[in-house]
Amino acid sequence: MCFSPILEINMQSESNITVRDDIDDINTNMYQPLSYPLSFQVSLTGFLMLEIVLGLGSNLTVLVLYCMKSNLINSVSNIITMNLHVLDVIICVGCIPLTIVILLLSLESNTALICCFHEACVSFASVSTAINVFAITLDRYDISVKPANRILTMGRAVMLMISIWIFSFFSFLIPFIEVNFFSLQSGNTWENKTLLCVSTNEYYTELGMYYHLLVQIPIFFFTVVVMLITYTKILQALNIRIGTRFSTGQKKKARKKKTISLTTQHEATDMSQSSGGRNVVFGVRTSVSVIIALRRAVKRHRERRERQKRVFRMSLLIISTFLLCWTPISVLNTTILCLGPSDLLVKLRLCFLVMAYGTTIFHPLLYAFTRQKFQKVLKSKMKKRVVSIVEADPLPNNAVIHNSWIDPKRNKKITFEDSEIREKCLVPQVVTD
């Protein structure tokens, strides 16, 4: 605390006059101590700015590509995924900049309103992210386990998203309700209640001040349990055993296919040897057809194994990313509810909040850029962009660019205009005839 010196001069005379010379105006512009160390502020602000740039750029790219292609919006899964990307854009625009403001504020400033808005944004980001991830998990379970009879139709998906935004908005209002922001009484009653902001160790330990934490914690743990159960069911539906690369059933099926193919080959060879010269051609054809069928079966088996590996890998990445980003702050919120807030816990909460905001970068990578349809749309847009740049800036001296995107060899049509080349091509046909 900075106290202004007061110079008191007591003059005793006949009238006992007391003169007080206040020199408050001298120190009004003095340096006020910051609430956090400079290194702490610089490091966290740098990470938050990086999350704003990367998260905003990637999520806007995904939303623009989804809106440009109508066939992507027609899918229920893509609409639910777009809802998550819209949320990430809101977090990058509104929540992360407010966290930067909280980091750079001083102790002596009146931060009650800003702290209240910050807690509201944190509550909104936590609850809405968990609910959106929960909705995407249900959609993937619906696709993998019940592809023929889907529960999430287009109408139900729209109702689900409306309910998600209503609940998220309610979670945003909870910190304001805690401090009686909307009460009709005197407006100064709520200003002294700081919500998890580093102040002068003046924290309210009443349970009514932390209802927003009581909402965030159970929603997070419920989402984690549902994710673990749902992705386990998805892996079981795809015949993937956790901890093993391939199941025994697949190995038995492969062995049966091999034995059947070998017996068919032996039978074909025996039949060809026992038959006369007329059946030689038939035996060769059957052996060739068996070989082709074997190759197709092996190819299908490899594609299925690759798909299983990809699904298993993506499931692990989705679950581990959500746990890595949101588990620390959820555990710390539980600790604050049990022990009460302190300066150390509030500083740790800001660090863990930076980790939680990292989902704005990981969500486009996990839910959009890994989809094959989205990759095709992105490649087509990049091709058109490259072609437009080349057409706008032609190279001098009639230079030719050999690019697989612009001038693929497989699309070239070979034309023979010379009569000599035509005659050379027609010579073998005349000889065989």
UniProtKB/Swiss-Prot annotation:
GO terms for cellular component: plasma membrane. It is found in: Cell membrane. One of its GO terms (biological process) is cellular response to hormone stimulus. The chain crosses the membrane at residues 46-66, 86-106, 116-136, 157-177, 209-229, 316-336, 350-370. Glycans are attached at N16, N192. Disulfide bonds: none annotated. GO terms for molecular function: G protein-coupled receptor activity. It holds the Pfam family 7tm_1. High expression in adult and fetal heart tissue. Expressed in the brain, with enrichment in the accumbens, amygdala, cerebellum, cortex, and hippocampus regions. It is a multi-pass membrane protein. Residues 67-85, 137-156, 230-315, 371-433 are cytoplasmic. Residues 1-45, 107-115, 178-208, 337-349 are extracellular. It comes from the Eukaryota. Keywords: Cell membrane, Cilium biogenesis/degradation, G-protein coupled receptor, Glycoprotein, Membrane, Receptor, Transducer, Transmembrane, Transmembrane helix. CDD domains: 7tm_classA_rhodopsin-like. Signal peptide: none annotated. Belongs to the G-protein coupled receptor 1 family. Orphan G-protein coupled receptor. Seems to act through a G(i)/G(o) mediated pathway. May be involved in ciliogenesis. This is G-protein coupled receptor 22. The lineage of its organism: Eukaryota, Metazoa, Chordata, Craniata, Vertebrata.
